[in-house]
């Protein structure tokens, strides 16, 4: 089922997600709905808070990046078909020299900004089988992981840009909060909850 994506300004996007257990209600359905919602919105990642759930789950599928001819062939190959569910994730290390990439977010439509992140990340997480694993990722896969991980920590990519850039996008952010934006995917907005 395609779920509405929560827009900027909703308090759920600022909550630190709660860890879950294997008996979390409708877990498989929740994850399937998250993937379906992400694909419907042409995203490469989606975190549970973005569908209104303050829990520690995010899903990614970097396949759309694999067509980028500006990337080295080996990275294109890594990106193609990389699909993963991260449950109760914890980034244990970020390393390397920060690099900039123009990021966007399904919860913040029509806003894109350059964000600096480290190129390599070590992360502990469970997949749907709840077996804990530790893996190292780099490049765009690491970046997507860091972006989605931020969501389960209550952090948005707009928190990582300069105060000048924040001022320049303030009107857009206010419009999103008030639901004054149009997307081809379903969204719900903080102002609508207040009787707007």
From Swiss-Prot:
Free-text cofactor note: Binds 1 Fe(2+) ion.
Catalytic reaction(s) noted: N-terminal N-formyl-L-methionyl-[peptide] + H2O = N-terminal L-methionyl-[peptide] + formate
GO molecular function: metal ion binding; peptide deformylase activity
Required cofactor names: Fe(2+)
Enzyme Commission number: 3.5.1.88
Alphabetical list of Pfam families matching this protein: Pep_deformylase
Binding site for Fe cation: 105, 147, 151
Keyword Transcription appears in the UniProt entry: no
Domain of life: Bacteria
Enzyme class: hydrolase
Keywords associated with the record: Hydrolase, Iron, Metal-binding, Protein biosynthesis
Family statement drawn from the similarity comment of this UniProt entry: Belongs to the polypeptide deformylase family.
Function: Removes the formyl group from the N-terminal Met of newly synthesized proteins. Requires at least a dipeptide for an efficient rate of reaction. N-terminal L-methionine is a prerequisite for activity but the enzyme has broad specificity at other positions.
Protein name in UniProt: Peptide deformylase
Protein species of origin: Flavobacterium johnsoniae (strain ATCC 17061 / DSM 2064 / JCM 8514 / BCRC 14874 / CCUG 350202 / NBRC 14942 / NCIMB 11054 / UW101) (Cytophaga johnsonae)
